[in-house]
Amino acid sequence: MPTPNPAAMDFLLSRRSRPAKTLKAPGPDKAALMPLLTAAARTPDHGKLEPWRFIVLRDAAMRRLADAVADCGTRLGKSDEDIAKARDAWERSPLCVAVVEVQKDSPKIPALEQTYSAGAVCLALLNAALASGWGANWLSGWASHDRGFVEGALGLASHEKIAGFIHIGTEGATPPERPRPDLDQIVSWVSE
Protein backbone atom coordinates (compact mmCIF):
# COMPACT_ATOMS: atom_id res chain seq x y z
CA MET A 1 0.00 0.00 0.00
CA PRO A 2 1.21 3.51 -0.71
CA THR A 3 2.09 5.88 2.10
CA PRO A 4 0.11 9.06 1.42
CA ASN A 5 1.40 12.56 2.04
CA PRO A 6 -1.86 14.48 2.65
CA ALA A 7 -0.16 17.86 3.11
CA ALA A 8 1.58 17.58 -0.26
CA MET A 9 -1.62 16.47 -1.97
CA ASP A 10 -3.61 19.28 -0.34
CA PHE A 11 -1.02 21.77 -1.62
CA LEU A 12 -1.15 20.39 -5.17
CA LEU A 13 -4.95 20.44 -5.21
CA SER A 14 -5.07 24.06 -4.02
CA ARG A 15 -1.94 25.62 -5.56
CA ARG A 16 -2.50 28.88 -7.39
CA SER A 17 0.00 31.05 -9.23
CA ARG A 18 0.06 34.68 -8.18
CA PRO A 19 -0.08 37.27 -10.95
CA ALA A 20 3.31 38.92 -11.41
CA LYS A 21 1.66 42.35 -11.15
CA THR A 22 0.70 41.54 -7.53
CA LEU A 23 4.21 40.56 -6.41
CA LYS A 24 6.20 43.00 -4.31
CA ALA A 25 9.40 43.18 -2.27
CA PRO A 26 10.89 41.50 -0.50
CA GLY A 27 11.74 38.49 -2.59
CA PRO A 28 13.75 35.56 -1.32
CA ASP A 29 17.39 36.19 -0.52
CA LYS A 30 20.05 33.70 -1.62
CA ALA A 31 19.63 31.53 1.48
CA ALA A 32 15.86 31.28 0.92
CA LEU A 33 16.19 30.79 -2.85
CA MET A 34 18.76 27.98 -2.86
CA PRO A 35 16.35 25.33 -1.46
CA LEU A 36 13.82 26.34 -4.14
CA LEU A 37 16.43 25.90 -6.87
CA THR A 38 17.48 22.58 -5.32
CA ALA A 39 13.87 21.37 -5.42
CA ALA A 40 13.52 22.49 -9.04
CA ALA A 41 16.71 20.68 -10.04
CA ARG A 42 15.21 17.40 -8.75
CA THR A 43 12.89 17.35 -11.74
CA PRO A 44 12.52 14.31 -14.02
CA ASP A 45 15.51 14.28 -16.36
CA HIS A 46 15.79 11.24 -18.65
CA GLY A 47 19.47 10.39 -19.04
CA LYS A 48 20.56 12.85 -16.34
CA LEU A 49 21.49 15.39 -19.01
CA GLU A 50 20.49 18.49 -17.01
CA PRO A 51 19.25 20.26 -20.16
CA TRP A 52 18.60 23.49 -18.27
CA ARG A 53 20.26 26.11 -16.11
CA PHE A 54 19.18 29.05 -13.94
CA ILE A 55 19.84 32.79 -14.15
CA VAL A 56 18.83 34.62 -10.95
CA LEU A 57 17.82 38.21 -11.68
CA ARG A 58 17.29 40.86 -9.01
CA ASP A 59 17.77 44.49 -8.06
CA ALA A 60 19.32 46.57 -10.86
CA ALA A 61 19.09 43.61 -13.26
CA MET A 62 15.29 43.73 -13.01
CA ARG A 63 15.26 47.43 -13.90
CA ARG A 64 17.70 46.84 -16.76
CA LEU A 65 15.46 44.08 -18.12
CA ALA A 66 12.40 46.33 -17.84
CA ASP A 67 14.19 48.79 -20.13
CA ALA A 68 15.41 45.99 -22.42
CA VAL A 69 11.93 44.49 -22.82
CA ALA A 70 10.55 47.93 -23.68
CA ASP A 71 13.28 48.41 -26.31
CA CYS A 72 12.55 44.93 -27.67
CA GLY A 73 8.84 45.69 -27.88
CA THR A 74 9.49 48.91 -29.77
CA ARG A 75 11.81 47.09 -32.19
CA LEU A 76 9.17 44.38 -32.75
CA GLY A 77 6.39 46.93 -33.28
CA LYS A 78 4.40 45.89 -30.21
CA SER A 79 1.61 48.14 -28.99
CA ASP A 80 2.21 50.60 -26.16
CA GLU A 81 -0.16 48.48 -24.03
CA ASP A 82 1.80 45.26 -24.70
CA ILE A 83 5.09 47.00 -23.93
CA ALA A 84 3.74 48.51 -20.70
CA LYS A 85 2.41 45.13 -19.54
CA ALA A 86 5.71 43.36 -20.23
CA ARG A 87 7.74 46.15 -18.64
CA ASP A 88 5.49 46.17 -15.57
CA ALA A 89 6.26 42.54 -14.72
CA TRP A 90 9.99 43.33 -14.60
CA GLU A 91 9.55 46.58 -12.67
CA ARG A 92 7.24 45.23 -9.96
CA SER A 93 8.71 41.81 -9.28
CA PRO A 94 11.64 41.80 -6.84
CA LEU A 95 13.24 38.65 -8.25
CA CYS A 96 13.03 36.45 -11.31
CA VAL A 97 14.66 33.14 -12.13
CA ALA A 98 15.14 32.61 -15.85
CA VAL A 99 15.00 28.89 -16.56
CA VAL A 100 17.15 28.35 -19.63
CA GLU A 101 16.73 25.28 -21.82
CA VAL A 102 20.16 23.97 -22.84
CA GLN A 103 19.78 21.09 -25.28
CA LYS A 104 22.45 18.39 -24.95
CA ASP A 105 23.57 16.08 -27.73
CA SER A 106 22.34 12.58 -26.95
CA PRO A 107 21.84 9.51 -29.13
CA LYS A 108 19.22 8.24 -26.67
CA ILE A 109 17.31 11.26 -25.36
CA PRO A 110 15.20 13.13 -27.93
CA ALA A 111 15.28 16.93 -27.95
CA LEU A 112 11.57 17.03 -27.13
CA GLU A 113 12.12 15.12 -23.87
CA GLN A 114 14.77 17.68 -22.93
CA THR A 115 12.27 20.47 -23.60
CA TYR A 116 9.74 18.70 -21.38
CA SER A 117 12.35 18.45 -18.61
CA ALA A 118 13.03 22.19 -18.81
CA GLY A 119 9.28 22.83 -18.54
CA ALA A 120 9.11 20.49 -15.55
CA VAL A 121 11.87 22.53 -13.89
CA CYS A 122 9.73 25.65 -14.31
CA LEU A 123 6.73 23.99 -12.65
CA ALA A 124 8.87 22.51 -9.87
CA LEU A 125 10.40 25.93 -9.11
CA LEU A 126 6.99 27.60 -9.19
CA ASN A 127 5.53 25.01 -6.81
CA ALA A 128 8.56 25.14 -4.50
CA ALA A 129 8.20 28.93 -4.23
CA LEU A 130 4.46 28.69 -3.55
CA ALA A 131 4.95 25.87 -1.02
CA SER A 132 7.50 28.06 0.78
CA GLY A 133 4.95 30.86 1.16
CA TRP A 134 6.12 33.14 -1.64
CA GLY A 135 3.96 34.51 -4.38
CA ALA A 136 5.16 33.24 -7.74
CA ASN A 137 4.25 33.17 -11.41
CA TRP A 138 5.63 31.43 -14.50
CA LEU A 139 5.77 33.84 -17.43
CA SER A 140 7.23 33.74 -20.90
CA GLY A 141 5.89 36.30 -23.36
CA TRP A 142 7.00 37.60 -26.71
CA ALA A 143 10.39 38.89 -25.54
CA SER A 144 11.38 35.42 -24.35
CA HIS A 145 11.29 34.22 -27.97
CA ASP A 146 13.27 37.13 -29.39
CA ARG A 147 16.94 36.27 -29.99
CA GLY A 148 18.00 39.90 -29.66
CA PHE A 149 16.45 40.12 -26.20
CA VAL A 150 17.58 36.75 -24.81
CA GLU A 151 21.10 37.00 -26.18
CA GLY A 152 21.59 40.74 -25.64
CA ALA A 153 19.84 41.25 -22.30
CA LEU A 154 20.37 37.81 -20.74
CA GLY A 155 23.56 36.56 -22.40
CA LEU A 156 22.10 33.33 -23.75
CA ALA A 157 24.14 31.37 -26.27
CA SER A 158 22.66 30.79 -29.72
CA HIS A 159 21.66 27.20 -28.83
CA GLU A 160 19.85 28.20 -25.60
CA LYS A 161 16.19 29.14 -25.15
CA ILE A 162 14.05 30.53 -22.35
CA ALA A 163 11.80 27.84 -20.87
CA GLY A 164 10.23 30.35 -18.52
CA PHE A 165 10.65 33.33 -16.25
CA ILE A 166 9.66 32.45 -12.68
CA HIS A 167 8.88 35.69 -10.86
CA ILE A 168 9.01 35.32 -7.06
CA GLY A 169 8.13 37.83 -4.36
CA THR A 170 5.81 38.66 -1.51
CA GLU A 171 2.17 38.22 -2.40
CA GLY A 172 0.43 41.59 -2.58
CA ALA A 173 -3.13 40.33 -3.12
CA THR A 174 -4.70 36.89 -3.19
CA PRO A 175 -6.22 36.27 -6.61
CA PRO A 176 -9.66 34.75 -6.93
CA GLU A 177 -9.91 31.10 -7.85
CA ARG A 178 -10.25 30.49 -11.56
CA PRO A 179 -12.18 27.79 -13.40
CA ARG A 180 -10.32 24.50 -13.59
CA PRO A 181 -10.43 21.85 -16.32
CA ASP A 182 -13.47 19.57 -16.45
CA LEU A 183 -11.92 16.12 -16.03
CA ASP A 184 -14.91 14.49 -17.72
CA GLN A 185 -13.84 16.31 -20.90
CA ILE A 186 -10.14 15.45 -20.81
CA VAL A 187 -9.81 11.98 -19.25
CA SER A 188 -10.17 8.74 -21.20
CA TRP A 189 -10.24 5.39 -19.40
CA VAL A 190 -8.90 2.37 -21.27
CA SER A 191 -9.21 -1.06 -19.66
CA GLU A 192 -8.92 -3.43 -22.61
Kindly give the residue locations of the regions a language model identified.
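Short, electropositive alpha-helical surface patch
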Residues: 149-162
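Small-aliphatic-rich amphipathic alpha-helix that forms the alpha element of a beta-alpha
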Residues: 40, 97, 103-150
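Short intrinsically disordered coil segments
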Residues: 70-72, 113-114, 179-186
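C-terminal helix-cap and adjacent tail motif
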Residues: 2-7, 11-14, 19, 161-192
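A structural motif
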Residues: 92-98
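N-terminal amphipathic, basic helical "cap/leader" segment at the start of enzyme domains
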Residues: 1-92
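Short, charged/polar surface micro-motifs in flexible loops or helix N-caps
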Residues: 60-64, 70-71, 103-105, 148, ...
